[in-house]
Amino acid sequence: MTKTPHQDAVNEAVSNGSRKMFFPLILVTSLFFFWGFVHNLDPILIPHLRKAFNLSDLESSLIDSSVFIAYFAMALPAGYVMRKYGYKSGILIGLVLFGLGSILFVPAANSLQYMYFLGALFIIACGLTFLETAANPYVTILGPASTATRRLNFSQSFNGLAAYIAPAYIGPMILSGKNLTQAEMDGMNAPELHNYLLEEAASVKMPYLVLGLIILAVAVIIYFTAMPDIKDEDKEGADGASFTGALKSGKLRGGIIAQFFYVGAQVCVGSFFIKMATTAAGMGEDSAAKYLGFFGLAFMLGRFAGTFIMKYIDAQKLLLIYALINILLCVLVINGTGMIVVYGLIAIAFFMSIMFPTIFSMGIEDLGHNTKIGSSLIVMSIVGGALLPPVLGMISDKTGSIQNGYIVPLMCFVVIVFFAFARRKNRINNNAGE
């Protein structure tokens, strides 16, 4: 990776002011945990709101769509704020939106309107867009360029920790375990049905209210903390940054495409985990939520393991190997029965854990003064998480089998194989030419 003036400034700052940077870096790392936490409540919300509002798989997938459309809509504004006002401003805006959106779950639950929940999720996701657009590149530049991918994987490991904690400990608070059939609901009189739906919807209020207050408290702490905002270019370099300039990079173009399909795959696999566990393995939703916690734990362990393995195997090769393994695991999940399906999904989580940060780091490699623009464009590609889960839901509704829908993440991993192979081939050719 070519050193830029940005990286030289960062290295100097790290060596000269590491004590001053220690607390701010802890705060930034905590952001990875918090957005991972709220993202991994979505697979709990999907079966919960599907039950509360009697939704089809396609309708319940709109939860993911409302979240990831926000990434597409807000990535460019987030990038503009960072370029004009710096990383800290982007982080603060993100935290305020995140906190307010979480608190809005209280009136959404009181209203018993599905669209209000989607609106609150959209606001949360707008905040997450600012956070991810700022924090991901921030971590890659705070240290040697040669270890940027490993460093981002390590920070994202705390995202994986949240992927275990959220479903394992908050999931049982939200999921009541009451699974009434449509016939049982039809047999209720109006007051009984209203009270049942109100009880189901109300279980989300306290977790999201507490989360929102914590996020706003973090925003206050960061506001009063001196956050290093190392400039990645001089004024002339900043004026030269452009979308067309950034998109001239084949690495960035490939990263955008790969990230679109990766996020689509991750959301598909995770969001329908409970539906898969309850149908293929016949377990109750409360038990499925516990296994979703193991899914998150595997994701976290995969991040830590991947960070370690990258000391010995280059990132492109490891990404290629993991994508190939996940293709085989998707075949197993589609055709398997019983607990083998659940174990297959958990294994997919382990092997897809390194993909987001690895693709992200590869995509913005060598962008120089276009790094912030490139970061925004890759974050925009997260819209794959909005567009691909409804395809899975539609296949499930049409065929009557949720397992058939997992052809969608399988094809996503095929795209990632092509991306990783192309990047590895390019790296080998570059090394041969040196």
Q: What are the functions of these language-model segments?
A:
Residues 74-87, 174, 302-314, 396-397:
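Helix-to-loop junctions at the C-terminal end of transmembrane segments
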Residues 113-131, 340-355:
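Hydrophobic core of transmembrane alpha-helices in multi-pass small-molecule transporters
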Residues 62-80, 293-305:
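Central cavity-lining transmembrane alpha-helices of secondary-active solute carriers
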Residues 23-53, 135-136, 170, 269-277:
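Extracytoplasmic
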Residues 1-31, 35, 51, 244:
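Cytosolic juxtamembrane N-terminal segment immediately preceding the first transmembrane helix
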